[in-house]
Each structure stands twice: as C-alpha cells, then as structure tokens.
Regions:
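Active-site groove signature of glycoside hydrolases
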Residues: 1-22
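Beta/alpha (TIM)-barrel catalytic core signal, keyed to glycine-rich beta->alpha loops juxtaposed to Asp/Glu
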Residues: 21-203
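A short beta-strand-loop micro-motif that forms or neighbors metal/cofactor-
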Residues: 205-208
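Acidic/histidine-enriched, glycine/proline-rich intrinsically disordered or flexible terminal extensions
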Residues: 212-214
C-alpha cells in the first residue's frame, strides 16, 4: 500500500497457493485485511479447479472472505483451463483475468522468428515454444499470422482480440515494455473477429499437459 500510495487496495490477489498452508489460514488473513480496510476484494491465481473449489467451500463454511477473481494461464495456444477451471469460475461468478495472454510471445510473432529470440533459446528456462507447439501451437501461430494480415493488424492484436471476445475472460493482464505496445493492446479492443475467425483460430488446438500451476 505504501508503494502504491493508497490506503486501500481495490483487488489483492494471492500468487498461487501454498499446499502446506490450510485454506482457512490464508482466508482468515485476507478477511482480517478486508475488515481493517486494507483491501476491498481478493482474488487468487493458477491452481487446480478442485483447489479453488476447496477454497470457496472454506470461505462459505467459515464465513470468510471469498475469492472474486482468478488469474490463470490461458491464451489462444494454451486452453487447458477450459477443462474445469473456467466452467467453475463461470458457475461461481468469479472474474477471469488471464496472465500471459500473449503466451510469452508465442502467438505474437511468426513461428520461425521465435527461435531467433532469447525466449526461443532452448537454454532459456521460460522458452514456451516446445510447450505450446505440442498442442497444435505451430498451426495456431500460423493462423494468427494469417488473420493478422487479413485484418491489417499485428499478430499480438489478433491474440488479444481472441481474449477480449472470449466468453470466459473478463480482463486479460497485458504486460508491455513500451507505450507503443500498450496502445496496440488498447486498439485490439476495436478488432471484431467473426465466428469463423474464432473457429479458425481454435480448430487446430489439441489437449496438452497442464502447465503454469507451480
């Protein structure tokens, strides 16, 4: 709060969960922070759907603050959250705020260019290429490029437009390194992907191992 220069934080999100800490311990601490006026609302981030369900049951049973947002791993080339987490959030009226909506750049630049960047370096721990490629990612990347050319926009804007129009997503968390990229992200709100565009982007996707929970 001091760094932000505010008395109350509107939305305080926990960074994943500690499996060794009982849900009620964290939720009681957040409830206390809310009652003392330090936070208004609380959310959480990447976990299994059963873990979120346990958190929600604990809140109801113990009359504690309940999570209102989920910050999860979700983008056009990684959609495993559609299995359980997103339907759960929809049923419980929990806002979805995906982190990494551009998949560390995977759907934001031509596939061949990924290998020529630091993020595409096989020695880079955060190299997303092998993870997303095995789920039909290469073809998804190529289709993002095609639609970007058709719409006269960047690949990143198509990837964001897919997020903006997604029925589950409330507000993707977009990280930028320049004002230009921030402006592009805002401009992507004006892109109207047709139903056939969305189907074209989603059709190559194949289920893949869940990543991003640890």
């Amino acid at each position: 709060r001091r760094r932000l220069g505010v008395d109350t934080i509107d939305l305080y999100q926990t960074h994943r969960i500690d499996p060794d800490t009982p849900p009620e311990t964290t939720l009681r601490a957040l409830t206390d922070a809310q009652r003392r006026g330090k936070i208004r609302h609380a959310g959480t981030s990447s976990m299994w759907a059963y873990q979120l369900a346990e958190q929600l049951r604990t809140s109801e049973r113990e009359d504690l603050l309940s999570y209102e947002t989920m910050q999860n791993h979700y983008h056009v080339a990684y959609r495993e959250e559609e299995r359980d987490m997103l339907p759960l959030c929809d049923a419980e009226d929990i806002g979805v705020l995906p982190w990494g909506p551009l998949g560390q750049g995977f759907p934001a630049r031509p596939f061949d260019d990924l290998e020529r960047t630091n993020r595409g370096d096989p020695e880079n721990f955060h190299n997303p290429t092998p993870e997303y490629e095995r789920g039909g990612g290469k073809e998804i990347n190529e289709r993002v490029a095609e639609l970007a050319a058709d719409h006269g926009v960047t690949m990143a804007q198509i990837a964001l437009a897919w997020q903006y129009q997604n029925e589950y997503v409330d507000a993707p968390i977009v990280g930028t390194t320049s004002v230009e990229h921030l402006e592009e992200a805002v401009e992507a709100l004006e892109i109207d992907l047709s139903a056939s565009d969305v189907e074209y982007l989603e059709e190559p996707y194949e289920p893949q191992p869940v990543i991003g929970h640890e």
